[in-house]
Amino acid sequence: MWDNHQALNQVADWLFTLAGLTTIYLMVQWTIHLPLLPLKEVHIRSNSGSGELRHVTREQVSDVVHREVGGNFLTIDLEAARHTFEKLAWVRVASVRRIWPNGLDVVVEEHVPLAHWGDSALVNRQGEIFNATSDEPMPIFEGPRESVREMVHQHAVFTKLLQPLKQDVEQVELSPRRAWRVRLGNGTILELGREHLEKRLERYVQTHDLVVARLNQRLSYVDLRYVSGFAARGTR
């Protein structure tokens, strides 16, 4: 082989190519790990029209970046960073992209709360439970966790049916036996049972004023689980 000049030239070319590729690889690795490419700026905005955030603070984002987002501009794992931002209490969905030469652009969709769920969680408009608290006046949902989307739907139905009376839904309860109970903003409790919910609530709305006039007092409790009527109790 050592007398074969053609073979020696091929080996030399191969070694030269390997050395060149190794050098390029090492230079790339050295370059991307340079301290000259640290992440210095994180631009965060809402995906809403205004771009303003309602619940997520820039301090929270900065803290997350310093504690959990590793790497520099070139080495950062954008998918891992996205998951990290989505751990923030009010972030429903996040997207992350690089901004040359040392920044990140983070766009978040914040949860829009619809109701309280227990003492330390909320329900958003998509029927998802997330761990956050709010002082905003909202209805309270109580029921099986797996039924939360159904409760969001029924809350919308109840709210629409009660519009003629201008009565608000303050609490929606769904028992383990799937019986529904609604408490209104004026304190009235409506027992709706497990079936014919809309029909029963429509009956309440249609006869409310007549029943209140006869009793001459506000209703405190209404049992709508009867076939063709309901039982009502006044505040006195």
UniProtKB/Swiss-Prot annotation:
Residues 1-14 are cytoplasmic. Signal peptide: none annotated. It comes from the Bacteria. Residues 37-111 form the POTRA domain. It is a single-pass type II membrane protein. One of its GO terms (biological process) is FtsZ-dependent cytokinesis. It is found in: Cell inner membrane. The chain crosses the membrane at residues 15-37. Keywords: Cell cycle, Cell division, Cell inner membrane, Cell membrane, Membrane, Transmembrane, Transmembrane helix. InterPro entries: Cell_div_FtsQ/DivIB_C, FtsQ, FtsQ_C_sf, POTRA, POTRA_FtsQ_type. Essential cell division protein. May link together the upstream cell division proteins, which are predominantly cytoplasmic, with the downstream cell division proteins, which are predominantly periplasmic. May control correct divisome assembly. Belongs to the FtsQ/DivIB family. FtsQ subfamily. Part of a complex composed of FtsB, FtsL and FtsQ. This is Cell division protein FtsQ. It comes from Nitrosospira multiformis (strain ATCC 25196 / NCIMB 11849 / C 71).
